[in-house]
Amino acid sequence: MPRLLTKRGCWITLAAAPFLLFLAAWGADKLWPLPLHEVNPARVVVAQDGTPLWRFADADGIWRYPVTIEDVSPRYLEALINYEDRWFWKHPGVNPFSVARAAWQDLTSGRVISGGSTLTMQVARLLDPHPKTFGGKIRQLWRALQLEWHLSKREILTLYLNRAPFGGTLQGIGAASWAYLGKSPANLSYSEAAMLAVLPQAPSRLRPDRWPERAEAARNKVLERMAVQGVWSREQVKESREEPIWLAPRQMPQLAPLFSRMMLGKSKSDKITTTLDAGLQRRLEELAQNWKGRLPPRSSLAMIVVDHTDMRVRGWVGSVDLNDDSRFGHVDMVNSIRSPGSVLKPFVYGLALDEGLIHPASLLQDVPRRTGDYRPGNFDSGFHGPISMSEALVRSLNLPAVQVLEAYGPKRFAAKLRNVGLPLYLPNGAAPNLSLILGGAGAKLEDMAAAYTAFARHGKAGKLRLQPDDPLLERPLMSSGAAWIIRRIMADEAQPLPDSALPRVAPLAWKTGTSYGYRDAWAIGVNARYVIGIWTGRPDGTPVVGQFGFASAVPLLNQVNNILLSRSANLPEDPRPNSVTRGVICWPGGQSLPEGDGNCRRRLATWLLDGSQPPTLLLPEQEGINGIRFPIWLDENGKRVAADCPQARQEMINVWPLPLEPWLPASERRAVRLPPASTSCPPYGHDAQLPLQLTGVRDGAIIKRLPGAAEATLPLQSSGGAGERWWFLNGEPLTERGRNVTLHLTDKGDYQLLVMDDVGQIATVKFVMQ
């Protein structure tokens, strides 16, 4: 009976052994899980073609370039598996024959001389380093079995491809291929594949950059094995043995540092693939370095290039020199908030075209104005009087842009831009106002470049794509016709040429901007394929006297444009939209008039949007007789009379806006354009038979303040003339509209006072204050 029980117990033990073994393995697996996940892994940012841009090492300073099996040349995989572990795809993580051989060699020698390690076991050692002892070997075997339990063969091989040591701080075939050879691991030759396959066996001793002879000998050993096993032909091996150990200049990836830093926060991936073009990025950074010597002290620059056909960002230079602290090289000016100056002007003109407020030849008024406490001026401190919208945009005049924004509405304008991804940054609690159009709000260069794509994307502004998988998103900003017209104006081709004469290749359309106090210089350009954004200035916001967009940013814009043209074929110009037609309009009314019509004082050819001919846009205060078109009554002699005079007949007359009178030839002023008044039945309120005169100070007078007085008080009177008075002191409008005005002068210097009445008569006087 005891013998029977013993035999039965043995059978029970044998039957239970697999279960107990499985239970023990399961428990050990739970107690000592595989260390697959790193807390702070190495990361790399790469260009769209896979070229590494910038590496971010892990806590141990290790650099990796993550790859998949598909990213690696089949030649390397053949060399690796056939040299290191021929039975990799079949064994369970441990090759019993190799282990037995290694164990016998180790036992007979009394020390570990042969590892017998499979690729799975090598991965186990990489994940969980251990001493080269028998206990360490058992631990390695256990980890290998764990790997095979939890992962597929492809996953284990992928771990090896990314964790194998290749010398120094390099881990993985991706990092090694780029660091040693300057190429993708997908493009390895037979010779290169063999060299890199053997390198992890002794990465310090076989480093090709330090020991090329050793690396060549090890490579040849692998090549011979490939020939013996029939993996590669003898001819291929022979040619590969003759290939010298060639290495690219050893350097870590150093492109787009600020862009790469930004991308770390946008992706959790160990390898962040971006839309940047590595070749273009390198050219842009070389250009920035060459440009550094032209910049004033403590100044920097920023550049962005966007392919407007698909909204991919192709180049991004955030500063002139990352390592130059005096120029705040660590500050990315592409996504910093700065005052854009006049760069917003094309948007307000395009939106006003769609709104039917203006057309390209609309008469605008570049004259002194004051709106409350806001008194804008032009960059050149002068005024140009009557000017078309096209000319105002080309010359970047401020007063016409303010006039159009006032009609469109600053709050509405800011909301429209915000809706398409161009937020304007205002001080806390501030509301959008007329200063927006002259740089009175902050903006980012990246947002500005994205918004400018509307001029190349049929009026739709796209969202920048930083990674290839980012969706293509866009929102309408203006109509296709308005975008086409504004782009032509920015290319300085506002004249409505015949279609046959339009350029076949899209020219560079561009706009500059200069912020208040010369703190920022901008230039944004749109060519056939790209939008180029340029900024120069001091990151700390201090002024750079003499820096403005045309002088500081446009030369850099042209250099970038030349680089782009040399790299890609020119794309054809977009055809003229059907909504855009040619027309001829008249000034001052702004609309077409028949030939010979006396109200057409000047004819201008222009593009028209949807055939619309908006009348001349007036300032808010220009109504009634101060406007452009109003009725007059004439007697049988052609003289002006009151409406209720006998035999009075009505006619409509177009005159120029009153503020433009000082810039008009005498024949175009109201005093000449309006027929003389009848003395027998004059128009109501008219005493223009008396010339307009100015009294209170004689021409050439010298004015002095009374002793102890802070100012000189100068009462002035006007007589004659008709209607209200318009007063200008040194070209600046005064708020008074009456016949008399009192000046309070505090500054010494030359003065010119001008008064104008409702019919355009002018009286002037010059004097000096001492």
Swiss-Prot record:
The active site is at E84, S342. One of its GO terms (molecular function) is penicillin binding. It is found in: Cell inner membrane. GO terms for biological process: cell wall organization; peptidoglycan biosynthetic process; positive regulation of cell division; proteolysis; regulation of cell shape. Its EC number is 2.4.99.28. Residues 30-770 are periplasmic. Pfam families: BiPBP_C, Transgly, Transpeptidase. Keywords: Carboxypeptidase, Cell inner membrane, Cell membrane, Cell shape, Cell wall biogenesis/degradation, Glycosyltransferase, Hydrolase, Membrane, Multifunctional enzyme, Peptidoglycan synthesis, Protease, Signal-anchor, Transferase, Transmembrane, Transmembrane helix. It is an enzyme of class 2 (transferase). The keyword Mitochondrion does not apply. Disruption phenotype: Deletion results in an altered mode of murein synthesis. It is a single-pass type II membrane protein. One of its GO terms (cellular component) is membrane. Disulfide bonds: none annotated. Residues 43-213 are annotated as: Transglycosylase. Pathway: Cell wall biogenesis; peptidoglycan biosynthesis. Residues 1-8 are cytoplasmic. Due to the fact that PBP-1c can neither substitute for PBP-1a or PBP-1b, nor rescue a PBP-1a/PBP-1b double mutant, it is possible that PBP-1c has its own distinct function. Moreover it does not bind to most of the beta-lactams known to bind to other binding proteins, suggesting that the penicillin-binding domain must be different from those present in PBP-1a and PBP-1b. It may function as a transglycosylase only. This is Penicillin-binding protein 1C. It comes from Escherichia coli (strain K12). The gene is pbpC.
